[in-house]
Amino acid sequence: MQKQRFCLDTTAITDSDVRKSLGVSNISESAEKIMDIVAQARVQLDISCHIPYNTVYKELIGFLIREECAPETLIKVDTWLVKKTPNRYEIKIPAEIFHEYIKDLRERINKGMRISENAMYETALEAYILSKPDEKDKEDVLNEVLSKTVNSFRDKYRNTLRGGTLDSAPDLDVLLLAKELDAAVVANDEGIEKWAQRLGLRFVNARDFPFILQEYLDLWDKK
């Protein structure tokens, strides 16, 4: 049987869906539960869980510290997650993947530009409508219109440019390390999932990950 390896994104530990699936209320509890299962899987079944260093590792540790996780939990992360930097100079990625990525990025930029243009038009129109009847103060009109338009613009722009694509170095490192190690990617991120499929990598949704490991352990205990 081929050795099982998993490559974890930050969302494998921190995502809210993971907490719900485990029946816990905070990140500290979910992180500790996951690390305990990862430790058992490593000791009993030699299943290794990897995390890209230092991009994803630094992101995860920073998140856990901000959530005031116990020092013992941080020690478990350091102990049971194998930290490794992807060999970015040796990993081979098909040129077609880069072609698809650039094409996807260009389409998103164009959509983002159209959203920006629409936001400017909506701002001007709202300002005109609000200022005409009552001769409102200029600053009041600007503040009222801009706060509404900017919030709407941010949501639309973020969803258009960042949703379903790779938008950070940690995201890319997860895929590169998984490819290097022939490991399954563990995340709850549309962009990572989409490009993992494009690269022919196994993908495990973060909310299912602890239960998959537990299933391995339960079967082993029955032997």
Swiss-Prot record:
Catalysed reaction equations from the record: Endonucleolytic cleavage of RNA, removing 5'-extranucleotides from tRNA precursor
Taxonomy, superkingdom: Archaea
CDD domains: PIN_VapC-like
Any GO molecular function: ribonuclease P activity
One of the GO BP terms on file: tRNA 5'-leader removal
Alphabetical keyword list: Endonuclease, Hydrolase, Nuclease, tRNA processing
Annotated InterPro entries: RNA_free_RNase_P
EC assignment: 3.1.26.5
PANTHER family in the record: RNA-FREE RIBONUCLEASE P, UPF0278 PROTEIN TK1425
Reported function: RNA-free RNase P that catalyzes the removal of the 5'-leader sequence from pre-tRNA to produce the mature 5'-terminus.
HAMAP family per record: RNA_free_RNase_P (MF_01078)
Name used for this protein in its record: RNA-free ribonuclease P
